[in-house]
Each structure stands twice: as structure tokens, then as C-alpha cells.
Amino acid sequence: MFPVFRLKKQSVKRKTVVFLGSSVTKGFAAHNNSFAEYIAKKDSCTCIKEAVNGTTLIDNGEDSYIERMRDRLDPKQQVDLFICQLSTNDATRNSPLGEISESRDLESFDVETVCGAIEYIIAYAKETWHCPVMFYTNPQYDSKPYAKMVEALLKIQEKWQIGVIDFWNDEQI
């Protein structure tokens, strides 16, 4: 774990970044302007934001992260970075955590669990857009289920060698 302020500065200038998430990614509390728009303006990059309030990682219907990623994001789009929000909605709804798979096969993940959905999203993004994948967590709040999700995400990070912007464990926030 490292503090967010110590992240290596790698420019996304003139790159295409996909953001997948729910209300935080959407910017719900800020008139639908989130950090994605800020990054786009600051770094002159193209941000594709696929965010719907109240949605989950687990595949439980047409607005789940997985369904929207498959159905609304162009697989032929050039993508330089894929960033996904670790949804608090899964924690609030007590979505099953599941297990980290030993497989890397897209079709082997249990997408009705948080771990399976995370791994599916990573595998799909890597196979479809051949780009780096990152997840970001929310800052700490009173939620044992979300704490377990963050713990699982950090283990998945080791398996898949993805980036994690870990606001949950960042004591500077």
C-alpha cells in the first residue's frame, strides 16, 4: 500500500481513458461532473464515462457494471487506460464476496459475486482493449462489507498486476 500522493505521474495527455462506475464516477453529488471531467480538461485527454447511479459490480441486470461494459462500450475503441470504481452499492446490498479464481479465463468467473465480477472486468478489459486496468476505492466509511471488498481487491491486484488507487487505506485522506 502506498499513499495516493506518491503515485507515479504518468501522463494521460491526449490518451483515451474509460471510467466505469456508479455515482462517484458519475459525479452524482456534483451535478454529474466528476474527477473524470477534471482529468479530461486538465490533461487534454478523451474520457469515456460509463456511470450509472446505484449500480453494482456483480452482474444482476442490465445496468450492472458488466452489462454496461459489454453493451455500451465500443470494443473497437482505442483505449489507453481503463479505470473502474469499486462500488459501494455492492457492500450496501450485501452482494456475495465470492472467491478469487485460480483461472484467468473470462468465462470461468462467477459474475454474481464481487470477486468474480472484478476478475471478469479485468479480463474483459485486458482482452478487449489491451490496456492497463486500474480500480479505485472509496475513502473509509463505516462498512465491514466494503472493507472486505477492498481486502479482496488488493489480493486480486497481486494476481492480475493491476493498478489500485486505494483511498480506503490512505491515511492522508
Task: Please identify what each model-predicted range represents.
Residues 20-21, 136:
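Short hydrophobic segments within beta-strands
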Residues 39-40, 125-126, 156-157, 162:
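A generic structural signal for well-ordered alpha-helical segments
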